[in-house]
Design a protein with these regions (language model features):
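Hydrophobic pocket/interface hotspot
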Residues: 34-39, 45, 65-67, 83, ...
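Generic structural detector for well-ordered beta-strands
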Residues: 25-29, 68, 82, 111
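Hydrophobic ligand-binding cavity/cleft-lining segments
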Residues: 4, 14-56, 60, 150
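Short beta-edge strand/loop motif at the mouth of beta-sheet-based domains
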Residues: 43-78, 86-89
């Protein structure tokens, strides 16, 4: 009974207290096709992406890739997320974790919305959950959010001036 109570408490905390979402949005004066071609040109990430420095591997649903992020003002990290969604010109989503699932998991989503007038709304968000999330909330609110913003601005610049 004690074991069951502990499991239920951890599950409750993991679904409420131990969650965090950060989200950024930017309007880009370019078609979703143009934005997508830049977003998924992973070979150029080291020189063109100020936040995600590299993505290696076959970016296909179900596959694991290797990604390196370098948030401004924070230590960079390399991790191996699994691709959850890849819908051309619309969405790329992966799920990564620190050491094991439930400790610090991040579901990263890039979403492109066709505004129907030659422009795109680009949404970048990440849903974090796990036991360590409360310890990293400040870093997520500042460093990761700034990294998202920097990446979004660079994507906009590249899409609008290429």
């Amino acid at each position: 009974m004690k074991y069951l109570t502990t499991i239920m408490l951890v599950a409750f905390l993991n679904s409420t207290v131990m969650t965090k979402e950060i989200k950024t949005t930017i309007q880009i004066n370019a078609s979703p096709e143009k934005v997508w071609s830049i977003l998924t040109n992973f070979e150029n990430y080291p020189k063109c992406n100020p936040f995600i420095k590299s993505i290696k591997g076959n970016v296909k649903v179900g596959n694991k890739i290797t990604a390196r992020i370098e948030p401004p003002g924070a230590k960079g990290m390399t991790f191996k997320p699994r691709i959850l969604a890849y819908e051309t010109n619309k969405e790329l989503k992966w799920l990564g974790n620190l050491w094991f699932s439930g400790l610090f998991d991040g579901e990263h989503i890039f979403e492109l919305i066709d505004n129907g007038n030659g422009t795109t709304t680009f949404i970048q968000r990440e849903k974090f959950k796990g036991l360590l999330v409360p310890m990293f909330k400040k870093m997520l609110d500042i460093n990761s959010l700034n990294g998202f913003d920097n990446m979004n601005k660079k994507l906009k610049e590249l899409a609008e001036h290429e």
